[in-house]
Amino acid sequence: MAAAGAFKSAVARAQDVQSAPFKAGAGRAEVVFADDIFPIDGFVAEHDLLAVRVLLLDDGEHRTAIAVVDLTSITDGTIASFKSILTEIADVSAENALVCASHTFSAPHVFPPDQMPAGTDAARNDAKAKAFEVALRQAAQAAVTAMRPARLGFGEGVSRVSVNRDVETPFGWWLGADDAGFTDPALGIVRLEADDGTPLAIVMNFAVQSSVMDGSERASGGKLISADLAGRAARFVEDHYGADTVALFLVGAAGDQAPYLQAARHVVDANGNVGREDIHETGFTILDLLGERLGQDVVRTADAISMDSATTLQTHRATIEVPGQGSSPKNRPVGPVASFAYEPAGSVDMPVALMRLGDVAIVGVQPELSASIGVTIKRGSPFAHTMVVTMVDGGAKYMADALAYDRYTYEARNSPFAKGAAEMAAAKIIDLLNALKSDND
């Protein structure tokens, strides 16, 4: 009788989960720096405010979170700190939380106290860290407060705001803009809305770095902080739908993808010397135009999405092993080369996070993948819809495709992963997706 009672209790719990409404909530908070923090990391002021955005999802059995922070990258120690805040405020375990950098190139770096590079101003670093922590707390609390029954839908559009940044020069491959190079124009959108149709959150996934203002300074000197392309597009979407909507940008496989135009463009002179030509503050006009165009593409796609009220959540984590190579910030590429000797360095562990939202799969990895690798994963996925997201739960430099190694590109030479690692990782990730799909069908 006891066994029968336990079985009935299990059935009742399962029925409760099935009957529990799918809920979602999202929050946004601006990162506020004190005026006396400047100058910092070469930045002398702010052009636009950085932000933290949090999305919470709950199917009655699992609660998951996606946090997008306007930073270039996030260290392991800071990831752990951010996840503890999400656990404290939103009751989301570290396992079920994805902390993503928006990958804006126009933001100062934040380091945990035990990971600060030599020469770092500890007091200012602490002030930066606290500003982001306060914003995360505010965004997470806003997401908790906003939780309500919701529906989810996926759509895919197209945007043309990116370009392949690997260009061939007489001296070898270097950075720039190559219209003939491979790019992935697919724009993946997850729309979450309340029962009355009010958009709660728009999640956008696109393969482009937020680097319109990368390396650009004011005409009078000094850089300006900006959320760059991801932030401008997110603000456009939020302004379009209203104050109750939060737009989260998940950077795709953008290791070799740049905004179509940049304020400080790369040049190689007749002698093979590299440099940049900067149009200074005028670059923010480019940022506005590209951000608005991407935002318009997002809205156009989101408005055509059909919604589904039944959504099952699941998070799965794994570690895959791929071949590595010697890499150090001290020997980062400084220009094009005609040849290069890669140094094998054993194997490297690569964390992979999979998040299932009904028939949508989110693949999260740390390294910046080449766009072709992102497309390979999406095409091989058994799910109806797949998003490939980089800069998730930390960063690990570049994971370039095999062709990049043959060309000695910036990404291939600035990578801890050996030639073939990206293709191997893609195959293993597809295997993980197949296992996740079969376990739940």
Region locations from a protein language model:
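Conserved beta-alpha junction segments in alpha/beta enzyme cores
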Residues: 15-295, 301-441
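N-terminal export signals
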Residues: 1-13
